[in-house]
Amino acid sequence: MDFDFKAHIEDKPIEGFQSNILVLIIGLLGMFIFPNIVAIAIGMFLPQDFDLVFWSYIAQLVGYGLYVAILFLFIGKDRIINILKGFISGRNIKTAVIFAFFAYFGSMLINMIVTMLFGAPDSNANQDSLNSSFLTHPGLVVLLAVIFAPIVEELVFRYSIFRPLAKKNKVLAYIITMLGFAGIHFVSSVSVLLMELDDPATSSTAITTFLEDLKTLPVYLVGAFVLTLAYDANGNIATSILTHAFYNASQVLLMFISMYLLEDLTNSSSVIESFTNLFEYIKLLI
């Protein structure tokens, strides 16, 4: 299929205040409620020694899929086709690559500034969870981080929140979207803080850990800004989904290199053995 780099495909608007509110509610349910409902339903049929991490990812993937299905049923065939056309628009793909580049190097720059001012930030609880899961279930992490999360998060924050708000006040739309997007990446951090805050033995450590996690907030805000800018540039949700997917793919690749390849290059007795190990890890992802 030929890509038309000059094609400009904008999302078809959803008319009416109530309809836009309903789209937002569906999005919030899809992000926070549906995966938990699926997890409870699955848990009723699993043995006590089930793999918690594996089934947690399955529940999240199924919950996200349920959200997308419900949203698409609500917005209708014409809008779905319009969104799908955006994924084969050369203009959108080109824009996504450019903005993913800006997101990656912008995050690096902000991270360097934060490190110089406050010391090197540790990865937050959300990132720690991804890192540990990648060791045991790399395929599921890739599926969630590179495909499902970009689709769901962009539909919620750029399509359901930024798009209608920008018609009223674009600056406010940027602020709310950025804060909301960055905030969801601290749900794990806040959960840990709240669980340990009442215990005098752990409260001090919990607060220190949470404050350390907050050092990563500027990085998420930069990512949120670039993703919102990507959507705003073309007015098509496919652009920000692709940008998000490309950016997350680069992060997963770096995680793979840091966890596996660099360790193998250090521990292996030859370059051939290093690449043999690399191919073995690639098999785990397929």
PLM feature spans:
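Transmembrane helix-loop-helix hairpins at the membrane interface
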Residues: 108, 136-286
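Membrane-interface segments at the starts/ends of alpha-helical transmembrane spans
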Residues: 46-59, 131-135, 203-215
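Hydrophobic alpha-helical transmembrane segments and immediately flanking/interface helices
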Residues: 121-135, 139
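Generic signal for short, ordered secondary-structure residues
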Residues: 76, 89, 93, 134-135, ...
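Generic alpha-helical secondary structure signal
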Residues: 91, 124-128, 214
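N-terminal, membrane-interfacial amphipathic/helix-forming hydrophobic leader that caps
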Residues: 1-121, 190-195, 217, 246-286
